[in-house]
Swiss-Prot record:
Keywords: Amino-acid biosynthesis, Aromatic amino acid biosynthesis, Glycosyltransferase, Magnesium, Metal-binding, Transferase, Tryptophan biosynthesis. This is Anthranilate phosphoribosyltransferase. Pathway: Amino-acid biosynthesis; L-tryptophan biosynthesis; L-tryptophan from chorismate: step 2/5. Binds 2 magnesium ions per monomer. GO terms for biological process: L-tryptophan biosynthetic process. Mg(2+) 1 binds at residues 92, 224. 5-phospho-alpha-D-ribose 1-diphosphate binds at residues 80, 83-84, 88, 90-93, 107-115, 119. One of its GO terms (molecular function) is anthranilate phosphoribosyltransferase activity. Anthranilate 1 binds at residues 80, 110. The keyword Transferase applies. Its cofactor is Mg(2+).
Length: 336
């Protein structure tokens, strides 16, 4: 099947849903040779992947993943694409703990691909054991309100594509598929993307995948809601998608410079997150976490608007709730 699909894609013709599903099934089941995987990924990148193709790929990846179904009323993920190459600290990981004081979070993530520190790297540096059984992850979401879904544990079929991705060294559709394939089936999502042009497209994919609410965001070169300039947001709510731009000043947050929110390696980023949660860092780094958490609480229908979300996010940090969630997760996974 992959050969027929390749013939089509190199002529810049789009795959229909069934064809795209068959391609991903071939890759995930080990039926596609590495050269074929490299060829189809490169051809798709040159053609430009459609909403229908990305949706089909994500559905099959979800089928091949190991899944958990935490017994919680709502579930949020803050997983983004990464790959913005700006070397900020792990904002979406810090955001996950702040938000988990109010909404259960299934944080999907991995080790760094292009940055110095992925979410898994910084969590390890903070003392979180990544090698826990997946059932333990389900329990931590139910009992603590947060769990970390380490991608390699939940997506074993990715072993066929990962070496090819590394050797290719270019962005492919897999860069966006990670955040679209939460193994706990989170029904709300704050998803940062590395390119502003992707926000509407991926909001449509999340709609096709059945999410209740999602914000797909890109902020002035960052795969986060930014405080250094404008952020483009595509919002999925009640089956409708609308796009708009925001700036930090709209919400009374001071504009920052990129150097104010830069991170370093995993150890340095863990130190920054600790300082935010312990109340030692009260400047730009805290501000950007608060703003992202506020939008996450808004889209998860926990805050009626972003302003209320900001108050809740500040309370989570100031009252030590975010720090407690981190400490509880470290302890819970240590036993695992």
């Amino acid at each position: 099947m992959i050969t027929e699909a390749l013939k089509k894609v190199i002529e810049f013709k789009d795959l229909d849903e069934k064809e795209a599903e068959a391609v991903m099934k071939d890759i995930m089941s080990g039926n596609a040779k590495p050269t074929q995987i490299a060829a189809i990924l490169t051809a798709l990148r040159m053609k430009g992947e459609t909403i229908e193709e990305i949706t089909a790929f994500a559905k099959i990846m979800r089928e091949f993943s190991l899944k958990i179904n935490p017994n919680v009323p709502k579930l949020l993920d803050t997983c983004g694409t990464g790959g913005d190459n700006l070397n900020t600290f792990n904002i979406s990981t810090a955001t996950a703990f702040v938000v988990s004081a109010y909404v259960p979070v299934a944080k999907h993530g991995n080790k760094a691909v292009s940055s110095k520190s992925g979410s898994a790297d910084v969590l390890e540096a903070l003392g979180v054991n990544l090698n826990v059984p997946i059932e333990r992850v389900k329990e931590s979401i139910e009992k603590i309100g947060i769990g970390f879904l380490f991608a390699p544990h939940f997506h074993p079929a990715m072993k066929f594509a990962t070496p090819v991705r590394k050797e290719l060294g270019i962005r492919t559709v897999f860069n966006v598929l990670g955040p679209l394939t939460n193994p706990a089936n989170a029904n709300y999502q704050l998803m940062g993307v590395y390119d502003e042009k992707l926000t509407e497209k991926l909001a449509n994919v999340l709609k096709n995948l059945g999410l209740k609410g999602a914000l797909v965001v890109h902020g002035s070169g960052m795969d986060e809601i930014t405080t250094i300039g404008k952020t483009k947001i595509s919002e999925l709510r009640n089956g409708e998608i609308k796009s708009y731009y925001i700036e930090p000043e709209d919400f009374g947050i001071k504009k920052a410079k990129l150097e104010d929110i830069r991170g370093g390696d995993a150890e340095e980023n863990a130190k920054i997150i600790g300082e935010i949660f312990e109340g030692e860092e009260v400047g730009a780094k805290r501000d950007i976490v608060v703003l992202n958490a506020a939008f996450a609480l808004y889209i998860a229908e926990e805050a009626k608007d972003v302003e209320e979300g900001i108050k809740l996010a500040e309370k989570s940090i100031d009252e030590g709730k975010a720090l407690k969630k981190l400490e509880d997760l470290i302890e819970f996974y240590r036993e695992g």
